[in-house]
Regions:
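Amphipathic repeat-derived elements
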Residues: 1-9, 38-47, 57-65
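Active-site acidic/histidine clusters and adjacent loop/turn architecture
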Residues: 1-33
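Short amphipathic alpha-helical surface micro-motifs
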Residues: 14-17, 51-55
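Intrinsically disordered, low-complexity boundary segments flanking structured domains
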Residues: 19-23, 34, 55-61, 93-94
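Extended, low-complexity, intrinsically disordered C-terminal regulatory tails
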Residues: 24-54, 98, 108-110
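Catalytic cores and adjacent binding grooves of peptidoglycan-active enzymes
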Residues: 59-132
Length: 132
């Protein structure tokens, strides 16, 4: 059974308890890595500068503490395998819905949560966030 490494566990610990619980269930079935949890102002500005985020500090879900967002990717990470990210997102969202049916979780390739990715203009494949 896969498990999170030390760095992933540290990043995960900065996230909302629901995101931690979902990720801890997902890792039991699919090997994955936590790329990002909470982002401070410097990290958020850097993410925007690199084109990894459009939200400026303190407006990003990663900027809350605990973080209302997590960047989680199937391991090993292959940034060119978009289908794998999509498959992984479906698994993550399914686990999330089973665990927290009344919590809206949004994936970074379906920002409006309508299961239509063709209307997305900013693709952030490893990103999941809680919308309340």
């Amino acid at each position: 059974m896969p498990k999170f490494g030390k760095v992933s566990r540290q990043r995960l610990s900065t996230c909302d308890e629901k995101l931690q619980n979902i990720a801890n269930e997902v890792i039991k079935h699919v090997d994955c890595t936590v790329l990002c949890g909470h982002r401070n102002e410097k990290d958020q500005n850097e993410a925007v500068a690199k084109g990894h985020s459009k939200a400026t500090y303190p407006n990003g879900r990663h900027n809350a503490y605990p973080s209302k967002a997590i960047d989680l990717a199937p391991y090993p990470v292959d940034w060119e395998d978009y289908e794998r990210f999509t498959l992984f997102a479906g698994f993550f969202l399914g686990i999330a819905k089973m665990m927290y049916p009344d919590t809206k979780i949004i994936w970074g390739n379906d920002w409006d949560g309508d299961f239509d990715t063709k209307d997305t203009n900013f693709r952030d494949y490893p990103h999941f966030e809680i919308r309340e």
